[in-house]
Amino acid sequence: MLSLVGLGPGRGYVTEAAAEAIKNADCVFYEDYTAPLDVEALRRLARGEPIRLTRADLEDHSGRKIFECLKEGKRAVLVTGGDPMLATAHAAILALARRRGYRVEVVPGVSIICAAFSLSCLSIYKLGGVATVTYPRGGVYSTRPYDLVEQNLQRGLHTLLLLDVREDGRFMPPREGAEVLLQLEERVGRGLFKEDLPIVVVYKVGWGGSAVYATLGEIARSDLEGPAVFIVPSRLGPVEKECLEGLSARSSTR
C-alpha cells in the first residue's frame, strides 16, 4: 500500500492521520523540493531513517525506489510539505501506483493555498487561479503571471502567485519575486506590475513568518525570506479591506 502524506506548510501542522500513516509504514520517503518539510518531525515519527527523494527520483525515474518497496509487499509513504496532491509529480506517482494494482490512500495536509488565504483574510471564493513566478530560463521570462493577474483584475478576482524553487532547493525570496514582476512590466509594458501595485506576501508559514501587505516596490526592497507566496488582490469586500488595512498597519511597525 502507498500513502501520500502531507505534513502541512511548516512546524506544528502534522495531523494525527499523517502521524499514524508514517508510524505504520515500512518505507518512508520524502521530498522537499516542492515545499519545505519538517524533517525532524518526520524522523521522530518514522521507524527508520526517512529516505530523501530528488526531483529526478520522482519525475525522471517515476518513483522507482518507492515501487521497489511496494514490490516487496511493504507499506510505503511519500511525505511532502503542504498538501501532497498539489504537485503534479505526486499525482503522477499516485496514478502509476493505481495502474500497477497497488492500494493508494491520500492523507491531506494544510496547503499553502489555504494558509495564505487564512492569514490574509481574503475570500478564497474569489481566487481566480494560480501561477508561478519563475526565474528567467535562458533570459526568457514567463508571462503567465502577467496574463493571469491582468485577467483576474478585470474579473474582480484575486490571484495567487507561487514563487520558484531553484534546482538546488533554494526558495525564491519575496524580493526576487517582486524584481521578476517588475522586469515583466518592462517587457510587457501594459501598466500592470508597477511599483505601487498592492500585494499580500505570505512568507515562512510555520517557520516564524506571517503575512504583510505592501506595494510591489516595497517588497522589492524588503528583506523578507522565502518560502513565500504572493496574493494580488482585486475588488475588496468591507471585511477584506479591513483585514488588509490591519496587515498594512502591522507591516509598517516592523
From Swiss-Prot:
Enzyme Commission (EC) number: 2.1.1.98
InterPro entries from the entry?
Answer: 4pyrrol_Mease (IPR000878), 4pyrrol_Methylase_sf (IPR035996), 4pyrrole_Mease_sub1 (IPR014777), 4pyrrole_Mease_sub2 (IPR014776), Dphthn_synthase (IPR004551)
Q: Which Pfam families match?
A: TP_methylase (PF00590)
Q: Where does S-adenosyl-L-methionine bind?
A: 83, 86, 111-112, 163, 205
In which pathway does this enzyme or protein participate? Protein modification; peptidyl-diphthamide biosynthesis
This entry's Gene Ontology molecular function terms read: diphthine synthase activity
Does the record bear Methyltransferase in its keywords? yes
Tell me, what is an example of a GO biological process annotation in this record? methylation
Q: What class of enzyme is it?
A: transferase
Q: Where are the transmembrane segments?
A: none
Question: What are the protein's UniProt keywords?
Answer: Methyltransferase, S-adenosyl-L-methionine, Transferase
Catalytic activity of the protein: 2-[(3S)-amino-3-carboxypropyl]-L-histidyl-[translation elongation factor 2] + 3 S-adenosyl-L-methionine = diphthine-[translation elongation factor 2] + 3 S-adenosyl-L-homocysteine + 3 H(+)
Subunit-level organization: Homodimer.
Please state which protein family the record places this protein in: Belongs to the diphthine synthase family.
Stored NCBIfam families = dph5
Q: What does this protein do?
A: S-adenosyl-L-methionine-dependent methyltransferase that catalyzes the trimethylation of the amino group of the modified target histidine residue in translation elongation factor 2 (EF-2), to form an intermediate called diphthine. The three successive methylation reactions represent the second step of diphthamide biosynthesis.
Q: What is this protein called?
A: Diphthine synthase
Q: Give me the gene this protein comes from.
A: dphB
